[in-house]
Amino acid sequence: WLSCQNFINTREYNEQYRSTKKRWFMADFYQQQRKRLDILMEDGKPEGGKWSFDADNRKKIPKAKRHLIPDLEFPETNPWVDEAEAYVSQHFNDAIGDVAPLLYPVTFEAAETWLQGFLVQRFSNFGDYEDALVPHQTWLYHSVLTPMMNIGLLTPQQVVDAALQYANRADVIDSDGPISIASLEGFVRQIIGWREFMRATYDDLGATMRSGNHWGHHHRLPKSFYDGTTGIAPIDDV
């Protein structure tokens, strides 16, 4: 078997890691990832003095700054996308969701452009506002790179390398929008930490998680969760 480029860790490494532990936790896994991959490390210690700057990733976006949130530059359509949209509209017209407009890149070139757009336009504010919610706003300062990594248009290693290289560029460091350690670490944590941890957990416990009912719930989700009328703002509005 060829190794899967969609993830940084191999399944064999994850199995070996889990075999030594009765339970595993994301924080421990992430620290091991940082050490093993030698990412954001200085003399064996975490750059910036701590492993996670998660506490610095929870700021609200001030109303006076909401107009500064950059718009995403969505990719242009092409004949193959048009053909796919027509096919889905014809054969799956009753399916949930909309086929248009095209939101995500579908080529390697467009995916690379999307990645660079994030680094230049949104990366510097990613850390501060990673957990922020704004009414009627979807993207904020997020990278929106997961779809491209999931289907192989970008690899996680490629994304991490690009982020580290961009943050360490002299012109970026000396600019009005340098990449703080909170932004850089927070972004790296999502990819080498959470994304890899959840893949490892899913490989090991996926069947149990899919078929289990840990909380003993038996009621169906009400219609309000689907049409956005729960009265809970983050669900209805964001």
Name each model feature, range by range.
Residues W1-Y104:
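Beta-rich, aromatic/charged-enriched effector core domains that present basic-aromatic interfaces
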Residues N57-V238:
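Catalytic cores of enzymes that engage adenine nucleotides and/or redox cofactors via long glycine-rich
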